[in-house]
């Protein structure tokens, strides 16, 4: 047996961690991109053979299906929810724009603007 001395290598930290972080960021970005491109958020319609995720109709001898595409409003009143929210907000703010005498009379809480209250 002859003993040959093999060189010993020691691991040393990299001079800069910039390359490590850049590689991790690139891998994360690629993984996130693949995940987002493969995710299907459309509703499942149809059966195990016929899928209509973008809307359409199918009919054969025993069954028929009709599905409107997502994103198409079925109602002509698409502004009705927005108008309802604005009306509710307006009704909630009406008491704040009335004179103080009306507000004092209908307010029952201790923080009302009452001139006879000792904190005012």
Curated annotation (Swiss-Prot):
Organism domain of life: Viruses
Keywords in alphabetical order: Host endoplasmic reticulum, Host membrane, Membrane, Transmembrane, Transmembrane helix
Lumenal side: 38-76
Cytoplasmic side: 1-16, 98-120
A Gene Ontology cellular-component term: host cell endoplasmic reticulum membrane
Other facts noted in the record for this chain: TGBp1, TGBp2 and TGBp3 seem to act together for cell-to-cell propagation. TGBp1 is the main movement protein that physically cross the plasmodesma with the viral genome. TGBp2 and TGBp3 would facilitate TGBp1 function.
Family that this chain belongs to: Belongs to the Tymovirales TGBp2 protein family.
The protein's name: Movement protein TGB2
Gene name, Swiss-Prot/TrEMBL: ORF3
